[in-house]
Design a protein with these regions (language model features):
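ATP-dependent carboxylate/phosphate-activation module, predominantly the ATP-grasp catalytic core
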Residues: 172, 180-181, 192-255, 279-305
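ATP-binding N-terminal substructure of ATP-dependent carboxylate-amine bond-forming enzymes
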Residues: 1-103, 367-384
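Short glycine-enriched loops at secondary-structure junctions
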Residues: 32-37, 81-83, 209-213, 219-221, ...
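Conserved protein kinase catalytic/activation segment
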Residues: 271-273
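Peripheral (often C-terminal) accessory segments that flank ATP-dependent C-N-forming ligase machineries
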Residues: 142-144, 302-387
């Protein structure tokens, strides 16, 4: 039995990943940094290791190294941006010292996808569809605005979950808002605001070292929170061959090996699809792939261990809810009673939940509690809602 270690195991995706791995026959351990969290109560995690936060990177890597010295781990899989970046930066050292496999690309490749401006600059150079995007600094505000146009959004180069993203409609808006975002999140880009229909797409792919796609899933995201654009709380798995083809071409250009996740928006007026960002880690909605026949966690483990992996049989048509976040959507959305399918459709043959299930209900309850507590914190609420 292989031993799998999840980093950032407190996140919601750890529930889906642990469930998929455990049902496939692996032993699952997880580094958890938050007591009130999904992973803290997930029944599919065999061992919980209370770990420091990734913010102190040196301490975190020392802690990880000490753990690997005392325990056999075959594969490490990061669940979130911070741990994915740390693992990628230290991949060569960890694999050499501990004979462990790190399920993350080498850092030069990882950084091109993780960094918002670098990833879209690659799209610009290679002709992949994307919104006009430019690096933003206090010295180039007018130049960036002239290239991107208005309305636009200021987006931190390194962030997740819509944190730090604000809309601007004039140079005066940029001058007023940019310094605040820069102080909190660091370097930013200015990106043209896409007037979209309210629906966006999430494309998950796995590219092998031979350059073959051995797994893919497309989510049509219909409800998300924050309402201005954020994490999926209701989506459906669909077929969309052109999206898969575009994203696969981007991964080919990157010489990517491993799992990747794309966010794509459709322009309301033209119907054109544009890549918004690339996430080089497992998304919260990974369970949508699993219930549609694509077991990405197993694909990841088998591929990094050098085993042969066959293409998965993708069976779309499933609905996936993130109940804790969907509750927040219901509280804030003016469409709460008009939306179709109805928010009150809790059960059905093809309805699934990413934050828990009947056999593992506690993560859903814990997620609701921790989510409410986070939104009571003014700084977190402002980063998400701007209020």
């Amino acid at each position: 039995m292989l031993n799998i270690l999840l980093l950032d195991g407190h996140t919601v995706q750890s529930v889906s990943v642990a469930r998929a791995l455990k049902k496939t026959g692996y032993k699952v351990s997880a580094f958890i940094s938050e007591r009130l969290s999904f992973g803290a109560v997930c029944r599919y995690i065999d061992e919980r290791i209370w770990a420091p936060h990734t913010g102190d990177s040196e301490r975190y890597i020392r802690f990880l190294s000490d753990y690997l010295t005392r325990n056999r781990v075959d594969v490490i899989i990061p669940m979130y941006d911070d741990s994915a970046e740390l693992l990628s930066r230290n991949k060569a050292m960890l694999e050499a010292r501990f004979s462990v496999r790190c399920a993350v690309p080498d850092f030069p490749v990882f950084d091109k996808a993780h960094h918002k401006w670098k990833s879209l600059e690659l799209c610009r150079k290679c002709g992949f569809p994307h919104p006009a995007t430019e690096r933003l600094s206090e010295e180039n505000i007018e130049m960036a605005a002239a290239y991107v146009g208005f309305p636009a959004i200021i987006k931190p180069n390194i962030s997740a979950g819509a944190k730090g993203i604000v809309q601007v409609n004039s140079i005066e808006d940029i001058v007023r808002k940019f310094p605040v975002i820069y102080r909190q999140f660091g370097a930013c880009t200015l990106q043209h605001f896409i007037n979209h229909s309210g629906i966006y797409y999430n494309v998950m792919l796995y590219r092998s070292v031979q350059g073959h796609l051995i797994g893919w899933t497309v989510l049509k995201i219909m409800r998300y929170f924050p309402l201005k654009g954020g994490t999926s709380c209701y989506c459906e798995t669909i077929r969309h061959d052109s999206l898969i083809r575009i994203c696969a071409q981007v991964l080919d250009e990157l010489q990517w090996v491993g799992f990747a996740d794309f966010d794509i928006m459709e322009e309301k007026d033209t119907g054109k699809l544009k890549i918004i960002e690339i996430n080089p880690r497992i998304p919260a909605s990974i369970h949508g792939a699993y219930v549609s026949g694509v077991n990405f966690p197993d694909i990841i483990v088998r591929d990094v261990m050098g085993e042969s992996v066959e293409q998965s049989g993708y069976r779309p048509g499933k609905s996936l809810r993130f109940m804790g976040l969907d509750f927040m959507w219901f509280l804030f959305s003016p469409d709460r009673f008009r939306f179709r399918p109805s928010w009150f459709r809790f059960f059905g043959r093809n309805v699934y939940y990413q934050d828990g299930c009947f056999k593992d209900p506690l993560p859903m309850l814990m997620g609701c509690v921790s989510g409410i507590l986070k939104y009571l914190h003014p700084a977190f609420r402002k980063s998400k809602l701007g209020i």
